[in-house]
Amino acid sequence: RLNDLFKFSKKHKIKLASIEDLISYRLKYEKLISKIDTKTFFLNSGKFFLHNYRNKLENNVNYAITKGKFNVKNSIVVRVLSTRIKRDILKNIKILKSLKSLNKYKNFLLLIINRKDNAETSNINTLRYYGIGAQIIKDLKVKNMILISRSKKKIIGLEGFGLKIKKQIIVK
């Protein structure tokens, strides 16, 4: 298929671009999120920051909970949860369990994508949520990630956002 595209582009003098090129271009000129604010809060396990981001496509709020200092040179532990938030996020069992398991790391980012659709049945919006999550992660100055997930992930296009998964840790 790719060979056919090369032939077609050469014949019609059309330039080809990769998915990463397209994502990089759109990220440079089109932001899908805007930061609302950052709040500090304390739990028994220490000081955390809650970053609130508006998703411009769905007009809802997504959250990032961070602990520690981030440095572009270092790899940051990142866990992404995709759920429907109906009340205070710090009363959500899934979020509290994730915070408890992440607390063993000095620096981490827990990204909470607040989905409007049913996470179990909708694959249509998955790429859009990846883009929104990637923009939030990039806004928080993370470049290199140690991704914590329930299964091995092969996420195409993150390079277009300037993000790299250096390592994956599978949890149950």
Which residues does each predicted region cover?
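Catalytic domains of riboflavin
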Residues: 1-172
